[in-house]
Design a protein with these regions (language model features):
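Short acidic/glycine-rich loops and adjacent helix/strand connectors
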Residues: 1-320
């Protein structure tokens, strides 16, 4: 089984019996955050793959206009890959499977938070930003999914305005603890779906990076890890870059505490796993362990999108 992540932090993982091997493409091509395009889709790390007749499971964050499918087609044609699966709605499930597999838990509630994953059918500006799963050694069950179009309704306009960022930060801090007139909810297959125009922690940190210019690759990629570190030097008031980072850090901490409390209503297990790009936030991760004294926490050691190739391989062998 071969998992291939075609998102940012591109990676491959192949599983044979109980042995897993994982490779980050940036270690091979020396290009940080590299992700494939239709014009530039070749992986140097593919030289590690021994058998292209294996089953390939592709993962991605959800590009627009069928770009994921087009990239996968190019890769499969070049390497004559005949057996493959790509399900655009599995991004957060792969995060959860990867994290659970390397934890010591037999049961857990996995919370995935990032800047956007699968797109909602027929409403493609809404991307999956928060998810809660119950997971054990036999099954993974979706309990809650939040889809946000904040990237389109808010993000692309006037993000250099620091006052706008401060207002958005206050909204995120209270986001899950009050009813929003602009939210919509529905239940499908025992999972509660939320459609919102609001930001989550991943989107807010991306907005912060654009506001204070923590960007790489000609502005194409945000550097939220640097913003999280910068927050340690700031105040929870003021307009300096480090002050804004501190305010975002505190707002997203409150948001995540609310989400953890929500997760604990779905099952009696006391085991919580955090994954998705926002789980790179080491400072806030520690704070959750102090807030929830009787909860066992496990933080995905590879919570960014690179880990989804690992999760895809695990999902295929254990949960399909």
């Amino acid at each position: 089984t071969v998992g291939v992540n075609i998102s940012h932090d591109s990676s491959i993982c192949f599983k044979e019996n109980d042995k897993l091997e994982f490779f980050e493409e940036s270690r091979f091509n020396k290009k940080k955050y590299w992700e494939p395009t239709q014009e530039n889709f070749d992986y140097v790390s593919f030289k590690k793959i021994k058998n292209f007749n294996d089953m390939f499971i592709f993962s991605s964050y959800g590009r627009e206009n069928n770009k994921d499918e087009k990239i996968i087609k190019e890769i499969c044609e070049k390497y004559n890959i005949k057996n493959f699966i790509f399900n655009p709605f599995m991004h957060h499930i792969y995060h959860a499977c990867a994290a659970f597999h390397v934890s010591s838990f037999n049961t857990a509630l996995c919370i995935v938070i990032d800047g956007g994953g699968a797109r909602l059918p027929k409403k493609e500006t809404f991307q999956e930003t928060d998810s809660i799963y119950y997971i054990d050694n036999l099954k993974v069950e979706a309990k809650y999914k939040s889809y946000s179009n904040g990237r389109y309704s808010t993000f692309w306009s006037n993000f250099y305005n620091k006052k706008k960022l401060v207002k958005l930060t206050k909204l995120v801090k209270e986001n899950l603890s009050k009813e929003d007139l602009f939210d919509d909810f529905f239940v499908k297959e025992n999972c509660l779906y939320r459609m919102t125009h609001s930001y989550n922690p991943g989107l807010l940190f991306n907005h912060l990076c654009s506001t204070i210019n923590l960007l790489s690759n000609n502005g194409f990629h945000h550097e939220p890890g640097k913003a999280m570190g910068l927050s340690s030097y700031g105040n929870n008031y003021g307009m300096r870059d480090e002050d804004l980072a501190k305010q975002v850090q505190e707002a997203t901490e409150k948001y995540t505490i609310d989400l953890i409390e929500k997760a604990l209503t779905y099952n009696r297990t006391r085991n919580i796993i955090l994954s998705g790009g926002y789980a790179l936030n080491c400072v806030n991760n520690y704070k959750y362990t102090q807030y929830f004294k009787n909860i066992n926490f496990f933080i995905d050691p590879c919570p960014h999108d690179g880990g989804t190739s690992f999760g895809a391989a695990v999902w295929y062998d254990y949960y399909r």
